[in-house]
Amino acid sequence: MTLDMDAVLSDFVRSTGAEPGLARDLLEGKNWDVNAALSDFEQLRQVHAGNLPPSFSEGSGGSRTPEKGFSDREPTRPPRPILQRQDDIVQEKRLSRGISHASSSIVSLARSHVSSNGGGGGSNEHPLEMPICAFQLPDLTVYNEDFRSFIERDLIEQSMLVALEQAGRLNWWVSVDPTSQRLLPLATTGDGNCLLHAASLGMWGFHDRDLMLRKALYALMEKGVEKEALKRRWRWQQTQQNKESGLVYTEDEWQKEWNELIKLASSEPRMHLGTNGANCGGVESSEEPVYESLEEFHVFVLAHVLRRPIVVVADTMLRDSGGEAFAPIPFGGIYLPLEVPASQCHRSPLVLAYDQAHFSALVSMEQKENTKEQAVIPLTDSEYKLLPLHFAVDPGKGWEWGKDDSDNVRLASVILSLEVKLHLLHSYMNVKWIPLSSDAQAPLAQPESPTASAGDEPRSTPESGDSDKESVGSSSTSNEGGRRKEKSKRDREKDKKRADSVANKLGSFGKTLGSKLKKNMGGLMHSKGSKPGGVGTGLGGSSGTETLEKKKKNSLKSWKGGKEEAAGDGPVSEKPPAESVGNGGSKYSQEVMQSLSILRTAMQGEGKFIFVGTLKMGHRHQYQEEMIQRYLSDAEERFLAEQKQKEAERKIMNGGIGGGPPPAKKPEPDAREEQPTGPPAESRAMAFSTGYPGDFTIPRPSGGGVHCQEPRRQLAGGPCVGGLPPYATFPRQCPPGRPYPHQDSIPSLEPGSHSKDGLHRGALLPPPYRVADSYSNGYREPPEPDGWAGGLRGLPPTQTKCKQPNCSFYGHPETNNFCSCCYREELRRREREPDGELLVHRF
């Protein structure tokens, strides 16, 4: 099979003159049908000649070389190696869903354009063609509920969405600020390269299949001009973490650790997975490349590659089945490209989500013209503590390792205060404070340990080795007694609200991985044995708080209005002016000092504002529009096929055990589904547009069955599967027999909530979960397939447990939603009772 595929690829390259990487993409997209691939290539040649704009990053800095045609383009990258993907089913497995999979030809053109304009890993010029905007999902509220839910489960990483929202880490700001948009994690391939896949999806809308970002990351770490400065920042933070666990490295060990970091970023596959029992379903006679899993330092380097800040939304602790926090999750926080001048960076951050050792891009949805919602990302948690600022300390070239580390004077000279951190955020990002309504209260995040109270100050993970306690100020002696009473009262209220919150984090993920992670964590987490928590901040306030609050409110009104106007979209540097009036003679700008004042007040429990970075959302480029339209057309065809299959299954169910009529169906989709031949793409897409309210509901996630769960590593300490190292990240895969991975595993949607104005604001909140049924990773026990448990009324299923009261087992559609034992008892009861309708009336 390999020789045949290589021969076909060689013939295609010789006959068309296309690059090997583009040729492989075209052939794989058409399942190695040469004629179909040639047709796509001709279409690409025509589109490339006249339709696409010369640059995909409109408005970004730096000059761009005009793009040449396919035939005369100079090779700017080495030919793509022949990977060990000898079966065409591998391509279906890797990207069996998503926008980029449905439009492989146009995505191949976009990838080729982006990579052809790429440069080296240095900082003298933009290493890659970087967009200044973020990718947005299309407006799904224009479609009816069934088709919308089909797209949602196809594009959105729903288990991650539910897990992070329940943990109070994601979208908590939407509940307190109705003008903010909800961010959604995009489904991302899990082949060890998910960090770069997520970054590529967040900017361009397609995966990093050509490893373009990974190669740029490796080049910057290996030979970039920032290499030594990056190494110093990494070593400083690692040294502070080692102090927590009592580790001391020799110079040889430091060099070995650094070389290992560079090696992890390599684009060479780590290993290949064949068919074995450890994988979910496996792929017959196929192998797929798996890449080394990356660490938080690689996120920091990626910020320099992209020349833009990166914000990672993640929980802070990994928990076992008992809810015990036993390992920190170090990825969450802010990564600034500090080795690149702020004036040369994009100010709109790239936002990623991290859960269960997997990265996804967080994106918003395209809005209607009359919608006033804004896309923002908070730079504090829900308790108004500033997110960790990773690798922010560079001790300098003159730092003597091993000597200055123990010199308190030298240490104090490099520790960052809260003012310095705020100055960096103001310099690299467009930030602002969003006022909250008087009755708004942010949901509480999960505590670092199940016994920690909400008001306890978590011990800081020594990211950058900095501390903010000095900058927050000491408590006023005159107000200390009263504040202690108020703090104690707030703590009791927060403890009460957190009672159920901790229980919600107990999950099946901890049950399966808890013991193995504990076993492996000792050796793998030795250098990361830091205490959990974010940036440590004192809770005291300076004297004269009331006067300070009045001044802050008066000055904020004028400052906020001017700031919103000044917060432009271009990469404008915010350098602090010298000695501004009214800032107490501070070397930082008045805006920074005002932010410091507001943040101090918020950390004392008087939060009136949210400190956020603004996300730039611009118009899509032509290739993105084409890519989305092709995906919607493909999704419609798959949706119609799925509906027909479900209808056939309903008929079989009703004819077999059937005790009642088929579920009621909406007339709109039925009229379309029964047509043997569909209308053209555009008219078919419009056929799904209805007058439904603008709610956007997320279906409950499911495990997808035991044989098709998505394996992921958890921090460098996952289970050893099939003799592999515990940090291995396995690709997500499902049995090839299933036409769609989601078909049999996603339950029906719960009705969404509506805002007063009828918009979809707030409707993305997941349905309510009972404590007994919800888990920390967002998974639930496998529910009935969509549309099977509607009963006589045709409603979506609202429960998955056995219909028999007080039964802890789960039912199945084949047994009328009883478990097997209760179903047998029910059959025996019905045999004894002449009236079979008692089954319907009783339950």
Curated annotation (Swiss-Prot):
Induction comment: By TNF-alpha.
Query: What is the official name of this protein in its record?
Result: OTU domain-containing protein 7B
Q: Where is this region: Catalytic?
A: 167-440
Region (Disordered) location = 50-88, 442-587, 652-711, 732-792
Start and end residues of each stretch annotated as TRAF-binding: 152-401
Domain of life the protein comes from: Eukaryota
Q: Explain what the record says happens when changing residue 809 to A.
A: Does not affect interaction with EGFR
Regulation of catalytic or functional activity: Deubiquitinase activity is inhibited following interaction with PARK7.
Q: State its location(s).
A: Cytoplasm; Nucleus
Single GO cellular component term:
cytoplasm
Tissues of expression? Widely expressed. Abundant in kidney, heart and fetal liver. Expressed differentially among B-cells at distinct developmental stages. Higher expression seen in primary immature B-cells as compared to the mature cells.
Q: What is the lineage of its organism?
A: Eukaryota, Metazoa, Chordata, Craniata, Vertebrata
